[in-house]
């Protein structure tokens, strides 16, 4: 995992997914949620899918009035272009919250969990994801 910090956009997978969202809009969100559903059925979410889920949660929280101010510059343009289409996805908040919970569940289910646990930075990463989940829940 190419990561330089524990933040939602502090790794290559997250930035790649954000670029996909910028290009594809809501279709990228639908795609990552479908990939999460497939992964959960198989019992394991790989780090690329998990990173996409984290970024989708950031985008959704921001679009519903609970942004992470530190990310405004990075997500603002893509969100401005695709916000309406993103919010039109059925059950988006419920599905994204469920996916985020799976990413943060355990090392048996989530590669991101496993990688962060091995890195020695798990507590900081998990705290950041829990804070994101709280913002998403409040949104």
Name each model-derived stretch.
Residues 1-45:
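Short terminal alpha-helical segments
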Residues 24, 63-66, 103-106:
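Residue-level signature of the C-terminal ends
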Residues 28, 48-55, 92-95:
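Residue-level detector of well-ordered alpha-helical segments, enriched
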Residues 36-40, 49-50, 137-139:
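Gly-Asp-aromatic-enriched flexible segments
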Residues 42-44, 84-88:
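Helix-loop junctions that connect tandem helical modules in alpha-solenoid scaffolds
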Residues 51-65:
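Short, hydrophobic/amphipathic alpha-helical patches that form generic packing surfaces
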Residues 62-75:
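Short, solvent-exposed secondary-structure capping/transition elements
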Residues 90-139:
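Low-complexity intrinsically disordered segments
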């Amino acid at each position: 995992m190419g990561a330089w910090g524990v933040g939602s956009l502090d790794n290559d997978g997250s930035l790649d997914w954000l670029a996909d969202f910028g290009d594809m809009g809501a279709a990228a969100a639908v795609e990552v949620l479908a990939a999460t559903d497939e992964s959960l059925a198989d019992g394991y979410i790989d780090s690329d899918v998990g990173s996409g889920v984290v970024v989708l949660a950031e985008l959704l929280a921001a679009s519903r009035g609970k942004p992470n101010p530190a990310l405004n510059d990075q997500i603002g343009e893509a969100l401005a272009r695709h916000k309406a289409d993103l919010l039109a996805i059925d059950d988006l908040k419920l599905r994204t919250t469920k996916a985020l919970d799976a990413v943060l569940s355990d090392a048996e289910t989530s590669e991101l969990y496993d990688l962060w646990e091995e890195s020695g930075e798990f507590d900081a990463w998990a705290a950041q994801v829990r804070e994101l989940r709280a913002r998403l829940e409040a949104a």
